[in-house]
């Protein structure tokens, strides 16, 4: 009996020692000052870690196995100087937890993607990111807060606290200008405004046929392209390709100098468009900025 009691006591002491050992947990705290934004914000805080310093981490985020590390957490009413904590409990990609990220030197950046609350006509109230002219690209959305990238020696097995300050705000996007061949239209939709409970707009980019000004009363066939959110008429370039353009490799298409190919093809299309034997018609690309 004495032996059994001794074993139980020893086991209890061992467990006590185990659980009393220091538990290291790296944390990242994200905040912004009143000088950057004085109001509270609903949205999503995004933390990015990259070993590539050729560009900001927010421009390196992509799907796939070669993705940079990213974490995200939703926030409601985040105010100035309030710290949002990202620790081992926050889900990430491609590595799921902060604790499993390999130690090393990383370029670290955080961004706060703004959400809006919509009181819809169907009775539902939802909080969603509204497009602000960028085509639902959170890393370029005007009004989003982000931090200046900083290099940090990252050690997941430490109890350090990394503080990241959102010290920048993305500027509004200038709408594209009309040209001889491309016009832009923007109207408020009564139906969408009523449904979403706030002003909603539809846009269109119009490619005019060659000779349109000389024949203002002519009727033309119409081709409508309904994609996602085109920023302007694409693949149409009146200027010749830039001879000094620095080549960029396309990972998507596995093509060298793909940016140069795009300019060449866009200018070739323009030359065909104004050619004497090319059909004359209107092209419209629809722009619908929904949440």
Regions found by a protein language model. Give the residues of each.
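Positively charged n-region of N-terminal signal peptides that target proteins for export
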Residues: 1-4
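Bacterial N-terminal signal peptides
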Residues: 9-20
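Boundary at the C-terminal end of the N-terminal hydrophobic targeting segment
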Residues: 23-25
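A short, amphipathic beta-strand motif
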Residues: 28-34
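Non-catalytic cap/lid and distal C-terminal segments of serine-dependent acyl enzymes
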Residues: 35, 51-91, 96-291
